[in-house]
């Protein structure tokens, strides 16, 4: 079985690509990858020996471009699509699996032109423009936000350590690897009140804001586990009883799988406002909060147990394995 995985650009897309790669590897698939020289694709997969071959095309997103720049971006995708077709033919690829993002365009279009099965993983509650365009032609679209609610590929640690939270003793603020100033500012404005109630603070600041936030805690003599980024972030997350976070799909499903209640602060400039729609999905099931100016007192008075319990239907293991098994069945029919 020869599988071409394509797409990426950002960590959300790429973490899914990595999870699916590892699940396909367990099925002894021969794997290939096509991405872009833009974004993070190369830093994730350029030296990944699990892939038989990797191609990184000089392509960019089309959505926010106008005039000559849009024409140039489309031309680059068409050119890359011919190169993708060549790889697919030469390597006798059985199926293409797209995780979305502009870097998936070339290989996805190549698959359709060659009448090859195309499978799409849509991470968000609102489809990206490329996925919206390609979905009607795909063999199957996997998504955790719409029926049949496919399990999301997250690290097994989030399921293995899941627990229903009964009281708030530890809170984690997740500013992301780049940092979210809004979340960092909120954490600092809450810190004294949380300290008064003996709530342990874990705070991922992101690299850009680390020094400012670290200095604040030191100056105010507030004990906190403050760090810019940690490769073992999952170990920090599972210690917490409540999270304050952006609502990118991968983070949201990691927290949900761990039964960790959260206050989500959607990134306001996300394409199609998808972070807001991601957060609202859990909010409508009384399984999370969406930021509306809440105070630390609002969090301290929460029924943590009820919110954590309401996450149970959304906590499912082996998302990547189940998606891969489904793909394999459809290929082998």
Curated annotation (Swiss-Prot):
GO terms for cellular component: plasma membrane. The keyword Oxidoreductase does not apply. GO terms for molecular function: UDP-N-acetyl-D-glucosamine:N-acetylmuramoyl-L-alanyl-D-glutamyl-meso-2,6-diaminopimelyl-D-alanyl-D-alanine-diphosphoundecaprenol 4-beta-N-acetylglucosaminlytransferase activity; undecaprenyldiphospho-muramoylpentapeptide beta-N-acetylglucosaminyltransferase activity. UDP-N-acetyl-alpha-D-glucosamine binds at residues 10-12, 124, 177, 275. It catalyses: di-trans,octa-cis-undecaprenyl diphospho-N-acetyl-alpha-D-muramoyl-L-alanyl-D-glutamyl-meso-2,6-diaminopimeloyl-D-alanyl-D-alanine + UDP-N-acetyl-alpha-D-glucosamine = di-trans,octa-cis-undecaprenyl diphospho-[N-acetyl-alpha-D-glucosaminyl-(1->4)]-N-acetyl-alpha-D-muramoyl-L-alanyl-D-glutamyl-meso-2,6-diaminopimeloyl-D-alanyl-D-alanine + UDP + H(+). Transmembrane segments: none annotated. InterPro entries: GlcNAc_MurG, Glyco_trans_28_C, GlycoTrans_28_N. Belongs to the glycosyltransferase 28 family. MurG subfamily. This is UDP-N-acetylglucosamine--N-acetylmuramyl-(pentapeptide) pyrophosphoryl-undecaprenol N-acetylglucosamine transferase. It comes from Nitratiruptor sp. (strain SB155-2).
């Amino acid at each position: 079985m020869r599988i071409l995985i394509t797409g990426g650009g950002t960590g959300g897309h790429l973490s899914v690509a990595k999870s699916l790669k590892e699940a396909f590897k367990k099925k002894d698939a021969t794997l290939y990858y096509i991405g872009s020289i833009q974004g993070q694709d190369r830093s994730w997969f350029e030296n990944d020996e699990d892939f038989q071959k990797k191609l990184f095309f000089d392509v960019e997103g089309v959505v926010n471009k106008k005039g000559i720049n849009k024409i140039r971006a489309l031309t680059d995708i068409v050119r890359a699509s011919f190169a993708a077709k060549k790889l697919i033919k030469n390597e006798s690829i059985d199926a293409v699996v797209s995780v979305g993002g502009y870097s998936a365009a070339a290989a996805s279009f190549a698959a359709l032109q060659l009448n090859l099965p195309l499978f799409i993983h849509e991470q968000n509650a609102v489809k990206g423009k490329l996925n919206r365009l390609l979905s009607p032609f795909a063999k199957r679209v996997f998504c955790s936000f719409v029926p049949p609610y496919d399990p999301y590929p997250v690290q097994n640690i989030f399921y293995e350590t899941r627990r229903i939270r009964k009281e708030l003793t530890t809170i984690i603020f997740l500013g992301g690897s780049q940092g979210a100033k809004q979340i960092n500012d909120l954490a600092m404005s809450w810190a004294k009140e949380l300290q008064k109630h003996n709530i342990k603070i874990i705070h991922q600041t992101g690299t850009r804001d680390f020094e400012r936030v670290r200095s604040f805690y030191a100056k105010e003599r507030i004990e906190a586990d403050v760090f810019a980024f940690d490769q073992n972030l999952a170990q920090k997350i599972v210690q917490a009883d409540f999270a304050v976070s952006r609502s990118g799909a991968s983070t949201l499903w990691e927290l949900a799988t761990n039964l960790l209640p959260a206050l989500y602060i959607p990134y306001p400039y996300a394409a199609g406002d998808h972070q807001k729609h991601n957060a609202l999905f859990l909010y409508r099931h009384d399984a999370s909060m969406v930021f509306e100016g809440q105070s630390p007192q609002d969090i301290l008075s929460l029924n943590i147990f009820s919110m954590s319990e309401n996450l149970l239907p959304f906590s499912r293991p082996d998302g990547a394995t189940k998606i891969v098994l489904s793909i394999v069945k459809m290929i082998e029919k």
